[in-house]
Design a protein with these regions (language model features):
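N-terminal cap/lid segment of alpha/beta-hydrolase-fold proteins
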Residues: 18-48
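Bacterial signal peptide processing site
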Residues: 13-15
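Short, surface-exposed "cap/lid" segments of acyl-processing enzymes
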Residues: 37-40, 47-101, 105-108
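Gly/Ala-rich beta-loop-alpha elbow adjacent to hydrolase catalytic centers
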Residues: 152-157, 161
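C-terminal motif of bacterial Sec signal peptides marking the signal peptidase cleavage site
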Residues: 9-11
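The feature captures the conserved acid-bearing segment of alpha/beta-hydrolase catalytic domains
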Residues: 179-180, 184-252
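Alpha/beta-hydrolase active-site loop
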Residues: 113-143
Length: 266
C-alpha cells in the first residue's frame, strides 16, 4: 500500500498542470480559465504593479506535446517543456502579464469536451482556434483595464500571435520566439503533412508592416530554423525585425536571449 501511495504522489507531483501551478505561485500568478467558443482555455495571470496599467503583456504557448511519434498524435497536447510559461514568469516589467495556453492544453474533464486531435495537429492554427485565443485575451484585458496588448508567441504560438495581431486593433507590439511564421514552408522543410485546416501566418504579413515587432530565432534550432521567420520579416518590410542567435535549441532557455526591454517603451 505504501508503494502504491508513493507512486500516486509521484505521478501527481510530475503533473504538468501542477508544475505550472507551482511555478505560477512562486511568481505571484494565479490560474484563470477562460470560457470561450468552443474552448475553455487555461491561463496564468499576474496583475502587475502599475496602479493604472495601460498594457497587457500576453505570452502564447507553443504546440505542446502534439505528437507521440512522427505518425501518432498525442492524446493530450499539454506541453512537457512550456517555454512560453518560462518566458512569462521571467518578464521583469510592471504591466499585467497573461500566460495563455493553446486549446486543450492543461484543461481536464468537461473542459476538454471539444478537444479532438485535429486541434493540435492539422487545425492547430484554425480560425476557431484563433477566435478562441482572441476572446480570452479580450477577457483578460477587461480584468486589468488595459488599453492595449503586447503579443509574444513561442513556436506555433508565434504563428497564433501573428494571426491575432492581424485580427485585433489594440496590438502595440508583436514578438515571436522560434516562431512558425510560414507554415507551408515549414511543413515542406520538415517533410510532414501540410496544416490543411490551419491559417498560414505568412498570408497576413503585408498587413502588419506598420506594427513594431521582433522575431527571435537561432541557428541551433533544427525544428524551426531562422529561414522560416526570415521569409516573414521580408514580407512585412521589416527585415531588421528578425534577430538570430547562435546557441539555443528549439526548447531551450530563450528568456536569456529575448530582450524584454524591446517591449517596454511600447
Amino acid at each position: 500500500m505504501l508503494v502504491v501511495a508513493l507512486c500516486f504522489v509521484s505521478a501527481c507531483t510530475t503533473s504538468p498542470r501542477l508544475k505550472a501551478r507551482a511555478l505560477a505561485q512562486q511568481h505571484g500568478f494565479t490560474e484563470r480559465l477562460f470560457e470561450t467558443r468552443p474552448f475553455v482555455l487555461f491561463g496564468l495571470y499576474h496583475p502587475g504593479i502599475s496602479p493604472q496599467p495601460k498594457t497587457l503583456r500576453v505570452y502564447i504557448e507553443g504546440d505542446g506535446h502534439a505528437w507521440e511519434s512522427r505518425t501518432r498524435p498525442a492524446s493530450d497536447p499539454t506541453p512537457r517543456n512550456p517555454v512560453a510559461l518560462d518566458l512569462a514568469m521571467a518578464d521583469p516589467g510592471t504591466d499585467p502579464v497573461l500566460y495563455l495556453a493553446r486549446p486543450c492544453q492543461y484543461v481536464q474533464d468537461e473542459d476538454r469536451r471539444y478537444c479532438t486531435k485535429r486541434y493540435w495537429t492539422s487545425a492547430r492554427l484554425g480560425q476557431n482556434v484563433i477566435d478562441s485565443l482572441d476572446a480570452a485575451i479580450t477577457q483578460a484585458k477587461a480584468i486589468c483595464g488595459a488599453e492595449q496588448v503586447i503579443l509574444v508567441g513561442y513556436s506555433g504560438g508565434g504563428g497564433a500571435a501573428v494571426l491575432l495581431a492581424d485580427k485585433r486593433q489594440d496590438v502595440a507590439f508583436l514578438g515571436t520566439i522560434a516562431g512558425n511564421l510560414e507554415t507551408d514552408a515549414w511543413t515542406q522543410l520538415q517533410g510532414v503533412s501540410p496544416l490543411a485546416e490551419s491559417l498560414n501566418p505568412m498570408t497576413v504579413a503585408s498587413s502588419l508592416q506598420r506594427l513594431p515587432q521582433r522575431h527571435l530565432s537561432s541557428h541551433a534550432d533544427t525544428v524551426i530554423p531562422p529561414e522560416i521567420s526570415a521569409k516573414f520579416c521580408q514580407a512585412t518590410g521589416q527585415p531588421h525585425s528578425c534577430v538570430v542567435v547562435n546557441d539555443v535549441g528549439h526548447g531551450g532557455s530563450w528568456q536569456a536571449y529575448w530582450g524584454y526591454d524591446c517591449q517596454f517603451e511600447k
